[in-house]
Amino acid sequence: MELEAAKMIGAGLAAIALAGAGVGIGIIFGNYLSGAMRNPSAAQKQFPNLLLGFALAEATGLFGLVVALIILFAF
């Protein structure tokens, strides 16, 4: 296998983390909204936890993107 093809395959596999981050963010917001509809008084208390979960899930996706870009352009 050529080096260029291996780089493309590796970057594609590393980019799968972006799909995982998208699914995770969807689950986080979906669960927050269902909980907020059940108990609106607790929604304001849970909002900081929502933002923390969103940031952690997004950071995971961004790390995967950085790894994919490093594989493509640094090696």
Curated annotation (Swiss-Prot):
Keywords: ATP synthesis, Cell inner membrane, Cell membrane, CF(0), Hydrogen ion transport, Ion transport, Lipid-binding, Membrane, Transmembrane, Transmembrane helix, Transport. InterPro entries: ATP_synth_F0_csu, ATP_synth_F0_csu_sf, ATPase_proteolipid_c-like_dom, F/V-ATP_Csub_sf. It comes from the Bacteria. It is found in: Cell inner membrane. The chain crosses the membrane at residues 9-29, 54-74. GO terms for molecular function: lipid binding; proton-transporting ATP synthase activity, rotational mechanism. NCBIfam families: PRK07558.1 (NF005733). Belongs to the ATPase C chain family. This is ATP synthase subunit c. The lineage of its organism: Bacteria, Pseudomonadati, Pseudomonadota, Alphaproteobacteria, Candidatus Pelagibacterales.
